[in-house]
Amino acid sequence: MTNYWPRFTRDNFENSVPPIDYLNWYIPRLQEARRHNLSFSGMQYNWDIQGMLGEKIAEIGKPYMADIEDPRIIIAKREGVSPDNVLITHGATQGINIALLTAIAKIRDKVEGKIIVAAESPTYAPIPQTALILADEVIRVNKTPPTTGYGHWRINYEEWETAMKKSHIIMITPISNPSGWVLHIEDRDWIIAKAEENDVIVIADEAYNDAYRQIEQSRAIHTFGDNYISINSLTKVYAMGPIRFGWLISDSKTIAIAKNIFMTFSGVMSSPTMRIAAEALKRLDTVDKEIEYYRRENLPILRAVLEKHGIDWNEPLGGVFGCFELPNNMNSEVFADQHCKKHDLLVVPGSMFSDRMTSWVRVAWSIEPSLFKSAVEALDKSLDSALN
C-alpha cells in the first residue's frame, strides 16, 4: 500500500525533492465529485465578490497601489501591531516557505555545520517537507492524543527538549491538523521558554487560529517577542483560498528580511488578490458568525452518529474540523475508499497527516447544515457497513 503521510527525511530522494504524497490521494478523489463531502479542512462560505467590489470590479485587473486601503494596515489593526510587522504573501503555504527562508537567513552566517529544523507531527505535509528542501536536517517531534480520550493533544517534554537543543528552528501548528485541538497553554508556554533558552526561532502556522479567537490559548506566537513568526491567511477560516492571500507577522527586522525574500521570488502581489482581500478583510465578522452557526447546527448531528456507533468523540473547543479513531484499528484508507465511497461520501484518512494515525478519520462541519445532515447520514451508513 502506498504511504501518504508527511515525510521527515529525504530517504530515496537524494538529489531530488519528495512529493506531497497526500495530494496524490486527495486530488483524484476530489475530482470524483462525490455527492457528500466531509473532507474540507476550511470553512465553505460563498462570498459575493461582485457585491463586495461593486463598480470597482471593472478595475480588478488594474494596478492596485494607491488605489485600495493597504491590507497590511487592516491586518495590523486587527492584530494590534504596526504595518511594519506584516508581510502579505500568496497564501499560507507560500508563507511557510518565506518564513523558513527568513529564519535561515537570520542564522546561516553564524551556524557551523548543518541547519536543523524541528517540525511537529501530525502535520500538514508542506511544513516538514519545506524544511527538507531548505534546511539540512529535520527532526520530528510528536503530539499525542489524550490518554483519557478527551482534551488537548499533548507534547512529550523530554522528546521536544532533546530536539530543540539540537535545532535552530522549530515549526509548529498551534491548532493541530487533523485533531482541531489548540495547543495546551502549558505546552505553549513551555515551548516558548525552551526556545528562549536554546535560541530557537519559532515558526507557527496559524491558518486556523482565527476560528479560536475567543479562546485565550490561541494567542498568536508573534506576540511573544522577536524571532517568533506567525503565518496566517484568508484560506482556511475565511473561505478565500482561490485568491491565495496570506501574511506573516513578526518583529520589524524579521519582516524586512522576509519582504526582501518575497520580492526576490514574487515581486509584488497580484491586483485581483489585493483588491478582493482589502474588501474581505473588512467583513470577516460575517464568516465568524457563520462558523458559530455551523457549529451549533452541525455538531449535535455528528455527536449523535458517533455515539450510536460507540466511537469516542474528542470534540475541539472551536473551529470547523476534528478527528476520531475507528474501532478495532480499522484502516481509515480502506474505510474512505470502500465503505464511504459506496455511499458517495468523501472523508480524509488520518494517514494523510501521520503514520501513527492509520485508523483515524478527519471530518469537517464547515458546510451548510442541510448538506451536512445528508453527509452525516452517509457517514452513518458507511460506519454501519464498516463495523457490522
Spans of model-derived segments:
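Conserved glycine-rich beta-strand-loop-beta hairpin in the small C-terminal domain of fold type I
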Residues: 39, 278, 294-303, 313-326, ...
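PLP-dependent enzyme catalytic core of the Aspartate aminotransferase-like
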Residues: 80, 118, 329, 338-347, ...
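A short helix->loop->beta-strand "cap" motif at the edges of active sites that frequently abuts
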Residues: 115, 136, 197-200, 226
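Active-site phosphate-binding strand-loop segment of PLP-dependent enzymes
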Residues: 143-214
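Conserved core segment of the aminotransferase class I/II
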Residues: 226-296, 300-304, 381-385
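Conserved PLP-anchoring active-site segment centered on the Schiff-base-forming lysine
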Residues: 102-131, 158-161
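Conserved PLP-binding catalytic core of the aspartate aminotransferase-like
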Residues: 309-342
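N-terminal small-domain helix-loop-helix segment of the aminotransferase-like
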Residues: 2-98, 283, 386-388
